[in-house]
Amino acid sequence: MTGNDWLKYSNQGATRNDPLDPALIGAMSFLGDMGITMDVISGGQEAAGEGGARTGSVRHDHGGAGDVDFYKDGRKLDWNNPADMPILVQIIQTAKANGVTGIGAGDDYMGAGRFHVGFGNPGVWGAGGKGANAPAWLVAAYNGAPAGKVPSPGNATPWQPQGQQNALAGPFGVQGQSAQNTLAQQPQFQWTDMRSDPAMFMNRRNSLAMG
């Protein structure tokens, strides 16, 4: 991509309908070399007291931040797609190296694939704009973890083979049934025919009754 072909604005109908600060555009210009398009959904706004429409964070004042989607070959990148994670990690880390200080993301923040990128106090965040809600993968990427060491998105319990699930089933699951079968194989729990050994039959019957 040449010039600013990598940059697209789709914020004409948004409250924050101003362009990004040239400094932020410069910090994100590496996207052209990666073949990535950045689509600005929410851009800059006037600062408080300047008379223009504005909403939310002061980070967006004068184009100091944008809420954006990233596209590769016409497809929106999404952290829920494992194949996209190395690209997104590279974007986050290169942006930070170029001076971008604030990055927000999360399925429960602005939806899958949408990022806040900009200047302001350094940090990452997720739902509600809170650092405590920043996804683990975003924290790791922001702090420089290699793509292969960044945790997978989501909080789903890792899949376990059926045998391991059974091993954790507890005394009332398959594990308990197995234990019962083991006990049943022990001699003291085997049924003795009264006619073949009357004394043994009575002893075992009494033992089980008192157990």
Annotate each language-model stretch with its function.
Residues Y9, D39-V40, Q45-A48, G52, ...:
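Compositionally biased, low-complexity repeat tracts
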Residues T2, K8, H62-D69:
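Glycine-rich, often proline-containing surface loops adjacent to acidic residues and nearby aromatics
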Residues M38, G66, F115:
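A broad, low-specificity signal marking well-ordered, structured residues that form hydrophobic/aromatic
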